[in-house]
Amino acid sequence: MATAPATEKKAPAKKAAAPKAAAPKKAAAPKAAAPVGAATGRIAQVIGAVVDVQFTGELPAILNALETDNNGNRLVLEVAQHLGENTVRTIAMDATDGLTRGQPVRDTGAQISVPVGPQTLGRILNVIGEPIDERGPVNSDMTAPIHAKAPEFVDQSTEASILVTGIKVIDLIAPYAKGGKIGLFGGAGVGKTVLIQELINNIAKGHGGVSVFAGVGERTREGNDLYHEFLDAGVIAKDADGNPTPDGSKVALVFGQMNEPPGARARVALSGLTMAEYFRDQEGQDVLFFVDNIFRFTQAGSEVSALLGRIPSAVGYQPTLSTDMGALQERITSTTKGSITSVQAIYVPADDLTDPAPATSFAHLDATTTLSRAISELGIYPAVDPLDSTSRVLTPAIVGQEHYETARRVQETLQKYKSLQDIIAILGMDELSEEDKLVVARARKIQRFLSQPFHVAEVFTGIPGKFVPIEETVKSFKAVVDGEYDHLPEAAFYMVGGIDEAVAKAAKLAEEA
């Protein structure tokens, strides 16, 4: 498998690359050009996204990219299987409508490669690295194959430090690790995309390094909104004429949306990751890699799996589910050169966390943020379940003793309240002991205090977004579990930032009463 980090593209002489791109170019290895008179074949059959191609001479290798013309558009096919009788089975990266049997297909002699480097910043690309933002070609003279080996163990870094998000429930209960992998689990409509957009707002905008956003099988509208938000926030820079420019931009976007064929959705996460790896390995940067939604990567794999003739495994998923997931996730890691911190939204089919797709992702993650429908029904947003979310870095050695104890006491209070809910439902609050009544009152305040207004939701809610520093979060929750704010009404804790805002809101409520 090709593992070259980046390769020079044989192309007509162009303008010299910007001086700042010169340093990493030394590491780029020359790419073997597609052989002269490279193998050509003919389409034998087309079944949806899967195309069989028959060759007369040498067969292309597995994962090679083949090219054909489809009504004037370049269509890329990736070799998935050798069937015998000089036939290969391929997965199409775009719609196959209009293909005909007997149509010629050319072997490129290499894997699908995408542009990498500073010129990809501020651009929107598709799975095969073509720009889809109507702003002309990407002026990068470096490309990299989308399939690569994961870094060796000796090259990986194991330092643990916290990535502050400014979101109370996350920073307190399930903090994120720098250079770690984070999963946002949730069913349909509980707020995964809004949470990932808030994380982009809070982390990427203040982050000095580069971010890569891979939109995998999600709504085109959300991708469009995100692009315009980045433009407004200055994450994508503009030139003197007000047009987006790579110079000064901090984010590259790669989209393979819901309307794309499964081939594109199954590979677009790898295309985005390849761009992120370049910044990590060649420029030594700390990269943020956002994926929305990793479940669609699995779903696309299962769509083509049956067409490839594989026997389905549990719940109809592809038999190679954990291998496919591992091949992607093992590449998302921190090395001695730089780091990739990955935030992945993971759709949970029918709210069932034991479904093979989300369950396979769990094993790879450093922190899991589980979004609960029951909490969203209470109107508490972000609808993070504090008892079901976990983090590898929530240990006294990393977060400190005070933070660790506060988080555990908050969880303990909420767990006691959860166990008392059946009694309350049957007998009512009056049957509880005084001690239990106090636990319930505190737990309900904590529950509401874990809500927070988001910057990205400000246009819908009309409430200004809040970023809460981690020290203030710990101090506020410690005071609440210690009973310092038992005298404040529950409503004062809902949709505020720090504890000072809750006190001010309580005073305002008292005036209105």
UniProtKB/Swiss-Prot annotation:
Residues that hold ATP according to the record: 186-193
Cellular location(s): Cell inner membrane
Gene3D superfamilies to which the protein is assigned, alphabetical: 2.40.10.170, Bovine Mitochondrial F1-atpase, Atp Synthase Beta Chain, Chain D, domain 3, P-loop containing nucleotide triphosphate hydrolases
Source organism superkingdom: Bacteria
Enzyme class at the top of the EC tree: translocase
Region (Disordered) residue spans: 1-29
Protein role: Produces ATP from ADP in the presence of a proton gradient across the membrane. The catalytic sites are hosted primarily by the beta subunits.
The name this protein goes by in its record: ATP synthase subunit beta
Organism: Sphingopyxis alaskensis (strain DSM 13593 / LMG 18877 / RB2256) (Sphingomonas alaskensis)
